[in-house]
Amino acid sequence: MSPTTAAAAANSADAFVPVDEGTQIQIHVTAQCSGGACTFNTATNLVVGGNPVPLPPNTWARENITLRSSNRNVYQDVSYSAPTGAPPINRGSWNGPVNSRQLKSQNSALVSVTFNGGGSFEEFAVDGTSLPLDVRTGKPNTESNFIACADIQVTYPGVNLTTATACTTTHF
């Protein structure tokens, strides 16, 4: 999927997968860059009759978030909160029913989050910050774009589905 691009410093994207005739799983990704840093957030919910509703109490889900630039010489120094509101981390953690880890490479970061149990919208949301750095100099790179992509596998009784990848691109 090709990322949606914004001329401004913020952008968002959604992906859906149908569960049945009236229900869909939605993943939403937002990215914004300013002041040398990019923020991102993701949120997952059901959409029933056009309205967002939380996932059911017995949900297990795994979300993958990829953060990168189209410039292969940009390193993403990422910290994130999983779920939203938890203390920011840069490696991985266990926050109650949410387990996460981060895998880094020279030009991208992958945040993998496992959710156990349903609940509020916030429980299936992740937010964070990336400092795009030039690999050669270690200095902030505000010339290149920032791409945030996410997909999620959601399982609960009778359902085991994975969304398409939602990608958004923004610039400083």
Question: Where in this protein do the model-derived segments appear?
Answer:
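Extended, solvent-exposed segments with strong compositional bias
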Residues: 76-130
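N-terminal prepro-regions of secreted/extracellular proteins
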Residues: 1-58
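Beta-strand secondary-structure signal
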Residues: 41-43, 64, 147-151
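Short beta-strand/loop motifs in extracellular/secreted proteins, especially
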Residues: 59-63
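Short beta-strand elements
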Residues: 156-172
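Internal, hydrophobic beta-strand segments that form the core of beta-sheet-rich folds
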Residues: 122-157
